[in-house]
Amino acid sequence: MSNVRSDKPFVLAGRTFESRLLVGTGKYIDMEQTRLAIEASGAEIVTVAVRRTNLGQNPGEPNLLDVLPPDRYTILPNTAGCFDATEAVRTCRLSRELLDGRNLVKLEVLADQKTLFPNVIETLKAAEILVKDGFDVMVYTSDDPIIARQLAEIGCIAIMPLAGLIGSGLGICNPYNLQIILEETKVPVLVDAGVGTASDATIAMELGCEAVLMNSAIAHAQQPVMMAEAMKHAVIAGRLAYLAGRMPRKLYASASSPLDGLIK
């Protein structure tokens, strides 16, 4: 029984969350669909792109916070659309002003428009500045275990390696690197990007990830609200399967019922 896993709460920046599904707000047809899908997902943490979303910086325009009130959801501002450390740091500081001094941010610094791979050099620079500036940094990164370790050593509170390209729906492309990151990293690891359907989310959780973040997999589904509910259950199922521990893989069959004592 020494290998039995015990459940631990999902804690970020000193706060405990029940849901291990984090969701984005982009790509929906309107704010009402956004609201309905996020409600169906059961998510408590909702990430928003500060440079693309009105959080109050544009008076007179629809404000996402009217649909997703901060007293109900933890708003996680992100730096989507930033391609260097300077832009990312500036965006995080703007988000802190807009959200009444809240320090929780999702850092992402992209390398190019085509792949949206993270620029890990600029990400490391930005992370170091933001941590020193008092931010609680959750960081989007590659599935390189060494970079993940360096980001954790800088002081990031969560490492968020991609499972596949952003918006690709390719699923968990490199589970082996994710396993190394999970073994070597002492802070929460969340899969970010690449999830396409419920089974992808379950696999990420079965590997041992603390949580999964997604947007396109829900927003681009034929029925986003229904997919949001599917993802809610997929994450729960994956977490339970991880805690339960899967059976060993075997090359040959093993009968469910013993052959001894068969009726003759």
Swiss-Prot record:
EC identifiers of the protein: 2.8.1.10
SUPFAM superfamilies: ThiG-like
Chief subcellular location: cytoplasm
Location of the active site: K106
Residues reported in the UniProt entry to bind 1-deoxy-D-xylulose 5-phosphate: G167, A193, G194, N215, S216
Keyword Cytoplasm recorded: yes
Gene Ontology BP terms: thiamine diphosphate biosynthetic process
Subcellular location: Cytoplasm
Gene Ontology terms for molecular function: thiazole synthase activity
Matches recorded under CDD domains: ThiG
Entry-linked InterPro entries: Aldolase_TIM, Thiazole_synthase_ThiG, ThiG
Catalytic activity: [ThiS sulfur-carrier protein]-C-terminal-Gly-aminoethanethioate + 2-iminoacetate + 1-deoxy-D-xylulose 5-phosphate = [ThiS sulfur-carrier protein]-C-terminal Gly-Gly + 2-[(2R,5Z)-2-carboxy-4-methylthiazol-5(2H)-ylidene]ethyl phosphate + 2 H2O + H(+)
One GO term describing the cellular component: cytoplasm
Protein keywords: Cytoplasm, Schiff base, Thiamine biosynthesis, Transferase
EC top class, as a word: transferase
Domain of life: Bacteria
Pathway: Cofactor biosynthesis; thiamine diphosphate biosynthesis
Gene3D superfamilies in the cross-refs: Aldolase class I
Role summary: Catalyzes the rearrangement of 1-deoxy-D-xylulose 5-phosphate (DXP) to produce the thiazole phosphate moiety of thiamine. Sulfur is provided by the thiocarboxylate moiety of the carrier protein ThiS. In vitro, sulfur can be provided by H(2)S.
Complexes and interactors: Homotetramer. Forms heterodimers with either ThiH or ThiS.
Similarity comment: Belongs to the ThiG family.
Protein name, per record: Thiazole synthase
Organism: Pseudomonas savastanoi pv. phaseolicola (strain 1448A / Race 6)
Designated gene of the protein: thiG
